[in-house]
Each structure stands twice: as C-alpha cells, then as structure tokens.
A protein has these predicted regions:
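Catalytic core of pol beta-like nucleotidyltransferases
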Residues: 1-48, 57-63, 74-129
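Short beta-strand->loop micro-motif that forms the acidic, two-metal-ion catalytic signature
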Residues: 68-72
C-alpha cells in the first residue's frame, strides 16, 4: 500500500471498527486500497480524490451499514454514466466483502464550490482514501 495513503486508510479502518461494522480493520484497508487502485486504473489522472463519508467515516455505523465513497473527478461528471462505468467494480467488491459500497460522483469544481448539506458534511467529516 502507498505509504501516503496509510494514515487515511488507518483512520477509515478505525472509524469502521468504532462504528461496530463487521469488517476487520485489515479487510477494510484492503477494500479501500483495492477500490482506489481500480478507480485509478479506470480514470487515470482524471481521478482527483476518494473520500469515505457517512456513518462509517463518523464512526457511528451499525452492523450492515454501507460504505459511502465520494468519487471526485476532473472535468464534467455525468453521475449515471460513471455509475455504469464503475458498477461492476463496486458490485463485485461488495459481493466479495459482504458489504454494500455506494459511490457518489462529483466534479472537482463542484466539490470545491457546492454548498449542499452533503458536500459540507463530506468536507467536514470525510476521510480521504
């Protein structure tokens, strides 16, 4: 695993463990690292960042809670198109790890400028992956 990612992945693993999720920390680290690698291979330099958000990032997840990931991309983003492009990756990893991975897609410009409740919370509570 990239050492630059290690602290972020460790923080995400601790948040999941603290939230009562069924995933052991090592499995979460592996899942997040694999998700990032697959998205980097798919998007290349267009991938700006991945952020874990929601109950898992806050540490108040319950057993069975999903893993919410914000995917920030350079350039225009059509969420439906991105869901179609990544659906097989997310579904396969969800089945392999017995957890639901939910991806939300947004452009880098929107991430920086949008003031929706979701973006405010992601900026405040999100964990970089």
């Amino acid at each position: 695993m990239d050492t630059d990612l290690a602290p972020s992945v460790e923080k995400a693993a601790a948040a999941l463990k603290a939230g009562g999720a069924r995933e052991p920390g090592e499995q979460l680290r592996s899942l997040l690292s694999e998700l990032r690698s697959r998205f980097e291979a798919l998007y290349g330099p267009r991938l700006v960042r991945l952020m874990l958000f929601g109950s898992q990032a806050r540490g108040d997840a319950e057993p069975g809670s999903d893993i919410d990931v914000l995917v920030v991309l350079e350039g225009p983003v059509r969420p439906g198109k991105e869901i179609a492009r990544t659906g097989e990756i997310a579904a396969g990893m969800s089945l392999e790890n017995n957890v639901v991975i939910s991806c939300t897609f947004i452009s880098a410009d929107q991430f920086e400028r949008e003031e929706s409740p979701l973006m405010i919370n992601v900026r405040r509570e999100g964990v970089p992956v």
